[in-house]
Amino acid sequence: MNNVYESPLSSRYASKEMLYNFSSDMKFSTWRRLWVSLAKAEMALGLPITQEQVDEMEAHITDIDYDVARQREKEVRHDVMAHVYTFGKVAPKAAGIIHLGATSAYVGDNTDIIQIREGLLLVRKKLATVLDKLAQFADAHKAQPTLGFTHFQPAQLTTVGKRATLWMNELLMDLGEVEYRIENLRMLGSKGTTGTQASFMELFDGDESKVKELEKRIADDFGFAGVVPVSGQTYSRKIDAQTLATLAGIAESASKFATDLRLLQHLKEVEEPFEKNQIGSSAMPYKRNPMRSERICALARYVITDSLNPAFTSATQWFERTLDDSANKRISVPEAFLAVDAILGIMINVVSGLVVYPKVIEAHVMNELPFMATENIMMDAVKRGGNRQELHERIREHSMAAGKRIKEEGLENDMVDRIAGDPMFGMTREQLLEHLDPSAYIGRCPSQVDEFLSECVRPAIAPYLTGEEIKVEINL
């Protein structure tokens, strides 16, 4: 429909997999799976529930009549009870035991945790793919000297590949955070209205071992290591805050990468992919805008800002729970996942097609290298009998003059010619040029790249690169 607002995150940016994870089908079929799990555990622990009732429920996990649910919710003003009713319509023999002993948070919060886990698993896969692509890029360009920048002013040389490891190092931190969140995520379990499990103690005649076993069976059904040890009615909203802080961390790293790439594209040293028929500007046909990187930055700002929502929600929950969390988390949590999913998809696309222009890079290097080489030139001249302090002053004078020529007259750097013509140095132009090999100024860059990839990156991403390669289609 074109007359109803549609979020760009769903219509333009996020993947089908992530969209499904936060879809109504995923949500409400998971509610039904949770009701089945509860009924099976209660039956196994001695409550009067039959296999026939469980079988009937299991046969109707996905055939959700949303019209019936919507109509019922209008009548009772309660989404969970509307879906209990709707489930009971297709599983009439089980209608009387659906949701037995549970409160709304049993299906709502446990489903939220499941969606968070599945979302993090999707993020982890894409994050590992980004790191894999960047590792290939870093390895290919580990020995390509390039200007390093501090304050966005030319500094000492680095290499194109070494710079890529800086992006990767931050993403590797993010991968560790994602892994930690997945590993430590726990279900709410079956805690009852205020977290005391009083309703289940009543059902099981005060048998605490059965109440605890009930939760264990439910957690096992959904592949969790356990349930939260204590809670109010809901799981702590700090879990949402921590999850979105992790997603915001990915957004931070992605924005840093994309910002650097935008600056490199301005310098014409490295460019993001640009398709054959892509139009950069409606008015300036020659333009090649870094729109993918700009989109990464735009979405990253959204995620970083969005991460404040669950933080405020967690900080303002009262006692065992208040409902002012609900409307906010319905928006903030899924949309953070959708945005990060989009960011990582764009990054995979960009990193897979980065274009490096070595000749431009070399020209920029050679324009600055004469200044960088002056310390080595000075030491060589001292070895030939020169006075270090006098040579230092003469280099300062030549540097100022060469810099003025470049900045005010737009001419090339003539620092080498100035020193070659200065008898104080006693060096020919050829001798000076020996000091202008860029590879002599990159330190351990190639080795650092090799070590980082072999010792840190590849072991970390190897478990997640099995199976079909992720293919990303970007909607421009």
Predicted regions and their residues:
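A helix-coil-helix interface module used to build multimeric assemblies
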Residues: 1-198, 204-217, 280-281, 291-295, ...
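A conserved active-site cap/scaffold subdomain adjacent to cofactor or substrate pockets
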Residues: 234-269, 278-339
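Active/binding-pocket-proximal capping segment
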Residues: 271, 394-401
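Short amphipathic alpha-helical segments with heptad-repeat character
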Residues: 25, 117-128, 135, 161, ...
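Glycine-rich cofactor-pocket loops
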Residues: 139-161, 271-287, 320-327, 352-372
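Long, amphipathic alpha-helical stalk/connector segments used for oligomerization, subunit docking
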Residues: 302-388, 394-397
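Active-site-adjacent "gating/activation" loops or surface patches in catalytic cores
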Residues: 208-233
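Short beta-alpha connecting loops at secondary-structure transitions
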Residues: 19-23, 68-70, 278-298, 320-335, ...
